[in-house]
Amino acid sequence: MKKSFIISAAALSLFALQARGEKLGELLHNFTYQARIGYNLGGTAPIGMPATIRTLHSYTLQPNLLLGIDAHYPLDNKWGLMVGLPFEGKGMKIDAGVKNYHMTMMKGGEQLEGMFTGNVITKVDQSLATIPVQATYDVSEKLRLKLGPYFSYVTAHKFEGNAYDGYLRQGDPTGPKVELGHEDGERGEYDFSSDMRNWQFGIDVGADWYFSKRCGAYVGLTWGLSEVFKKDFHVIEQSMYPIYGTIGLSYQLK
């Protein structure tokens, strides 16, 4: 009797495992996978142009490549879910004119803090591993829309630059005046890399267009909702957010 019970229990367990395996296999079979390559274009900036930033002299493109893979699961013939893992760069280099812009910088081995009027060059480099989780809607067989949150871990970051051709009023706009020139040694240097966050999150919206069965193109926009700097960082008075557009190509693996 006991032996029969053990055999029956073992058989039921095998049937249950087989049924679960079939369901898991069916679930995995419905996934499709894509590889992506793209380019990010944008910047780390405040929301709205503050009055202290007067002009943008130049914007220099950076090697903001994106390489990733994502998986899509259809919920019905229109809606689905997509999750991905892109490794990407988000960087910028700008030259801007500012007035009464609060800054901390080094000049001649001395730290200066106050209100700067003149020109600033800022370079931002970030390397990130990102997980977007998006709802998808298939407008047609060729066009898919996507929207959802993203979460990024910043594996490396840099925020540095220099101030030149202007002057710094130490402390406040009426403080002692320090002249800054154009040549090396005459500029004020700054580096806020250690004040940047390691985690970011925001909204990711985009569209995929398939021009063949496996190949396609895509566009996207990632809008950061978390500031790039830590809470206790107050040198730059405006909150700074990563805002980038993406354009690229995709290839369906399965």
Predicted regions and their residues:
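Outer-membrane beta-barrel biogenesis signature
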Residues: L17-Q34, N77-K78, N100, Y164, ...
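Outer-membrane beta-barrel channels and translocator barrels
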Residues: L28, P74-D76, S140, S212-R214, ...
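Hydrophobic, lipid-facing positions within transmembrane beta-strands of outer-membrane proteins
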Residues: F31-Y33, P63-I69, A129-V133, F201-V205, ...
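Transmembrane beta-barrel strands of outer-membrane/channel proteins
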Residues: A35-L41, V83-G89, L147-Y153, V219-W223, ...
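Extracellular/periplasm-exposed beta-strand and loop segments of Gram-negative cell-envelope proteins
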Residues: G43-Q62, K90-S127, V154-Q200, S226-Y244
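Residue-level signature of outer-membrane beta-barrel architecture
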Residues: A71-Y73, Y137, Y153, W209-F211, ...
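Repeated loop/turn-to-beta-strand initiation elements of outer-membrane beta-barrel proteins
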Residues: K78-L81, K142-L145, K213-V219
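Outer-membrane beta-barrel "beta-signal"
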Residues: W209-Y210, Y241-K254
